[in-house]
Amino acid sequence: MTNKDLADLIFPNLEHDVDYYESLYPERELKEGEKVTRFAPSPTGYMHIGGFYQALTDYVLAKNSGGIFYLRNEDTDKLREVDSAVELIMSTLREYGIVPDEYEYKGEIVGNYGPYIQSERKDIYHAYIKKLIEIAKGQNVK
């Protein structure tokens, strides 16, 4: 069995490949020194001081460099997810003037590199995993 055969066996029905995603999400046109930072909270309740500190640090790094600060909700912990947590996170950030440049909130997508909800990015990751298997760069964990 070839690596391509294995990749096709594991991911038989992917709608898009790596080339598609790389054309959809081209490299950002950043000036030298500009940073792209991400705050990726899990929507499992109120924002705590550690999360706020990370958001503030990421925001300041991005803004001081002329870069981009984005919010991506890490909604993969479905057992502990709290319905209103995303609203609580956004309202806390906005209360302190930390407004993401890119985000997804209440059905609105702001930015060109979404989805900004982790669980909605699965197909992107699967395409890259499939490519790594095809070119024999995937790791076999035992």
Predicted features and spans:
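N-terminal Rossmann-like or analogous alpha/beta NTP/dinucleotide-binding catalytic cores
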Residues: 2-142
